Design a protein with these regions (language model features):
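Aromatic-lined, polymer-binding surfaces characteristic
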Residues: 159-390, 410
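Polysaccharide-binding surfaces and accessory modules of carbohydrate-active proteins
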Residues: 631-698
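Beta-strand-rich recognition/accessory modules
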Residues: 682-778
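Catalytic and substrate-binding regions of extracellular carbohydrate-active enzymes
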Residues: 448-659, 738-740, 746-754, 762-766
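C-terminal, helix-dominated tail/subdomain
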Residues: 378-454
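Non-catalytic terminal regions with compositionally biased, polar/charged low complexity
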Residues: 731-742, 749-880
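Structural helix-adjacent loops and short alpha-helical linkers that scaffold large soluble proteins
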Residues: 24-51, 57, 61-67, 88-108, ...
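Bacterial Sec-dependent N-terminal signal peptides
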Residues: 1-21
Length: 880
């Protein structure tokens, strides 16, 4: 009988062993190791990536061998005996006080919920065994300034950032150990992890007696407070610690922390307790929907994945329990994936918030998809909108593969990990079309130098497909429109000189901005006339400038947010689409948008493969208006049309301010000038931007220094207009002169070298029709028309126009092209486009051959030839 009982116990023990989760499990498993080693050996990018990872962490691992306290002492902890707090308290969303004294140092809580303008000095310069929590910091607005000691209660996210940095080193070391078996990396990572684990184990969730974060703190549901951050969506210490635990599982089991031996506990048990604290608090805090929900789940997914089966834990809540609520069933606190994906616009594939959140969320979801597929859950197959959401990045990407900036987004390179995750999935599922589309995106990033696979990190080594197939590049769209975001992109990338503009209305909410009817203009891979995005944080004083109409290229006062109406646009985005499917001509884009009392017509005019210019006709049905135009650069000069510098007088302040954001303008200079003028911005990389503006009565011109444009390197030529530099800004004030009848009309170009392409701009306006004649360097004369009614206007000799937008181009005195945007008539001499109903139509020459395009029936006259043509696109006209 004893032998039978012993056999039963042995069998039960073996069953338990079989049910226990094997490690690693999150990004790789033991069975993947050979494949990963082969990838490192065979693929140059993986070899370089691994070399970088090892090189970045090995110096610390070697130092740890000789001085094991060096890295540990730099963790932000409550080090001082008698003040090793076990319970901390919040007040006004910031750390207030602590009580209790643990037998070991406990992990320090952040000083504040909000950000500040400082970031930590290098690890080597940080104070070891810092008992006060005061942090040495460098100023983001002036990085060259000496570091200052930032008080603990004013330290923003510096404390958490410090610990995340050290845990990230431990992650890298743990991966290197798993690949190589070299114990120095394991010892380094284990000592960091164990110190963090035990120091967290003795800390209770923070209490918030005044309910400043919307809940009571502790274990009670509700509010936004996490376990180790005052916003659960930033509560990321366990995210990093979980991967250390995963790769080091066997080593940690064999080499437990000395304190665990003293209290008779195992690493696995304490890790489960600590990880479940982060998870359980995350389950009942944060936000139910939107980016808060996605970010909240992102904080706890990796800790969930390292948990054991449900029955391992006294509460019956293990890996499968929590995954059910991520993948299947929403709760009153958080939506599950099936409800998350309903947030995406089924037409555009876009998330409703600003670009940073829009593409940050899809990146997280696709990252989860790769991890969940390892657990047998295919969220991509079940939710095809995820693929559409990933591809929605292209219309919102410029030709340098940077994201558009509006709302509270900061900009920067597109996240190519999105496409790597999709390529991995498509490779696993043998989806040829998917492989081609994602490979095209990745190859573009590689060719532009915006993406380098050798920077993949250990997660990429684990999950990326070994190679990116070489495929044909996909043709870029010409126009995109998101009605929810009130955002239009216009692109003309048909030649080496690539043109792009963004035209958009304002939205209050969704991390978007009440920015007015705004415009951004691009050149040479940069947003040269951008939207301001260098604010410190949501809570900083400069937010009122950067996240307002004052930080945008618009007109004040008046419309700042609300519905926009597309009066005309071509290439047109049809209803139910995100991008255009057809285009009338390779040489022109335009859009005419109204919003409130404002109406703005913007056109991209390509004059050759290497040149082009932008038209901006901005109407405002107010008598007093300020036209704001920000352009990055080192200098702004304003001259008359003969090149004479206009005299400006220094001003202490504006006589009138239309928004509190005006307070952020400095170095105010003013001149009164009612004639045509030229504003020029000088930039690094030998780039100059020029804006010609036609004159109107009641004009005052201001040159001001606006705050920096961006905090991100690589978004401006030579990183100009980054802190502590300024953004040279033009303000054209028009008083007692209604700008609907007398609009702001400008022509903008960017060029390299000393020779501008636009030589002369002449106004030609009559009543509700505004126009200019543009003379360019290749003996080309363009006649531009913009009207707000259906009357027939004649602005120049032998010309007639009835429509929303028109362009007649002559080269050497001979008509080269004609373009009619939503109109009935465009004529010069014996060349004309005429229709009974409003149409979009054009005739143009390529290599001496005439082509036509039209959205409906149109009578075309070219010299003696006259024909009635039906709808068609880029069709050859056989004219002898």
């Amino acid at each position: 009988m004893k032998n039978i009982l012993l056999l039963i116990l042995v069998c039960l023990g073996n069953m338990w062993t079989l049910k226990a989760q094997e490690h690693p499990v999150i990004y790789a498993s033991a069975s993947d190791k050979a494949t990963i080693l082969q990838k490192i050996a065979d693929e140059e990018w993986a070899k370089e990536a691994f070399t970088k990872i090892r090189g970045n962490v090995e110096k610390y691992a070697d130092r740890h061998t000789a001085d094991p306290q060096w890295i540990i002492s730099r963790l932000a902890m409550y080090w001082k005996e008698g003040e090793r707090y076990t319970q901390c308290y919040l007040k006004n969303q910031n750390w207030d006080r602590g009580e209790g004294d643990a037998p070991v140092p406990t992990v320090r809580m952040p000083g504040m919920r909000t950000w500040n303008k400082y970031y930590n000095v290098p690890l080597e310069d940080r104070q070891p065994y810092n008992e006060t929590g005061d942090m040495l910091g460098l100023n983001r607005q002036n990085p060259s300034a000496p570091p200052i000691l930032v008080p603990y209660k004013e330290s923003g996210h510096m404390v958490r950032g410090n610990n995340v940095e050290i845990l990230t080193l431990a992650e890298n070391a743990a991966f290197v150990y798993w690949v190589t078996g070299e114990e120095k990396f394991a010892r380094f990572a284990a000592d960091i992890f164990n110190t963090w684990l035990i120091g967290t184990y003795y800390m209770n969730p923070i209490l918030d007696p005044e309910k400043s974060t919307g809940g009571t703190g502790g274990w009670e549901p509700g509010g936004i407070c996490g376990y180790y951050d005052y916003e659960q969506i930033h509560d990321d210490l366990a995210l990093h610690a979980a991967t250390v635990y995963d790769f080091l599982y066997d080593y940690l089991k064999a080499n437990p922390h000395v304190h665990l031996k003293e209290i008779g506990k195992e690493t696995k048990e304490i890790a489960g307790v600590v990880f479940k604290r982060f998870i359980d608090i995350g389950f009942i805090r944060g936000g139910k929907s939107g980016n808060w929900n996605v970010n909240g789940w992102n904080m706890i997914l990796r800790p969930i994945l390292v948990l054991e089966e449900n029955e391992t834990y006294p509460d019956g809540k293990g890996k499968d329990y929590y995954l059910h609520y991520l993948t299947n069933e929403s709760t009153i606190y958080h939506d599950a994936i099936p409800d998350m994906v309903k947030t995406y616009d089924p037409v555009t594939g876009l998330w409703p918030e600003s670009p940073g959140y829009s593409f940050g969320t899809i990146q997280m979801l696709l990252d989860w998809a790769i991890l969940l597929k390892r657990s047998g859950i295919d969220v991509i197959a079940d939710n095809p909108i995820l693929q559409k959401a990933a591809m929605a990045v292209f219309p919102w990407m410029d030709d340098a593969a940077n994201m558009v900036v509006f709302g509270d987004s900061r900009g920067g390179s597109a996240n190519f990990l999105t496409f790597e995750n999709l390529l991995t999935y498509y490779t696993q599922t043998a989806n040829k079309k998917g492989i081609e589309s994602t490979a095209s995106a990745l190859n573009k990033g590689l060719s532009l130098g915006k993406y380098n696979r050798s920077n993949a990190g250990w997660t990429g080594i684990c999950t990326y497909a070994p190679t990116i197939p070489v495929v044909k590049s996909e043709t870029s769209e010409r126009t995109s429109y998101s009605p929810h975001h009130r955002f239009i992109t216009m692109k003309n990338w048909t030649g080496p000189f690539k043109m792009m503009a963004a035209l958009y209305g304002g939205t209050d909410g969704y991390h978007l901005t009440a920015n007015g009817l705004a415009l951004q203009l691009y050149g040479y891979g940069y947003a040269l006339a951008p939207d301001a995005a260098a604010y410190e944080s949501y809570w900083s004083k400069d937010h009122v400038y950067h996240q307002s109409p004052v930080g945008a290229n618009t007109i004040l006062p008046g419309y700042s947010e609300g519905k926009i109406v597309i009066e005309a646009m071509e290439p047109m985005v049809e209803s139910g689409k995100f991008v255009n499917e057809k285009a009338l001509t390779p040489f022109l884009n335009f859009a005419d948008i109204s919003a409130g009392e404002k109406r703005r017509t913007v056109a991209l005019v390509r004059t050759s493969d290497s040149d082009g210019y932008y038209i901006d006709i901005f109407r405002s049905d107010l008598n007093d208006n300020d036209y704001l135009f920000h352009n990055v650069g080192t200098n702004l000069e304003v001259v008359d049309v003969r090149g004479n510098i206009l005299p400006f007088n220094q001003q202490d302040k504006f006589e009138r301010m239309y928004h509190a954001g005006y307070e952020w303008f400095t170095n105010i200079r003013k001149t009164e000038y009612a004639r045509n003028f030229i504003a020029s911005w000088t930039m690094p990389e030998n780039i100059t931007a020029r804006l010609w503006m036609t004159g109107e009565k009641g004009r005052q011109i201001y040159k001001v220094d606006a705050p920096a444009t961006t905090l991100n390197k690589g978004l401006t030529p030579g990183n100009v207009s980054m802190p502590p530099s300024v953004t040279p800004t033009l303000i054209v004030r028009q008083e007692d002169n209604n700008a609907k009848a007398h609009p702001f009309v400008s022509v903008y170009e960017a060029y390299k070298g000393d020779t501008p392409h636009v030589k002369q701009v002449t106004a030609m306006s009559v009543r509700d029709c505004a126009g200019v004649k543009v003379l360019t360097g290749n003996k080309r004369e363009d006649y531009v028309f913009s009207a707000t009614d259906s009357q027939v206007y004649s602005l120049a000799s032998r010309t007639f126009f009835s429509g929303t937008f028109g362009l007649i181009s002559e080269v050497g005195g001979k008509i080269y092209s004609m373009y009619l945007g939503k109109g009935r008539l465009l004529q010069k001499g014996n060349y004309s486009l005429e229709a009974e109903q409003n149409v979009y139509a054009t005739i143009y020459q390529v290599d001496g051959n005439w082509f036509y395009s039209a959205t409906g029936p149109v009578k075309v006259k070219i010299g003696k030839m006259e024909r009635i043509l039906d709808e068609g696109y880029n069709k050859l006209l056989n004219i002898k």
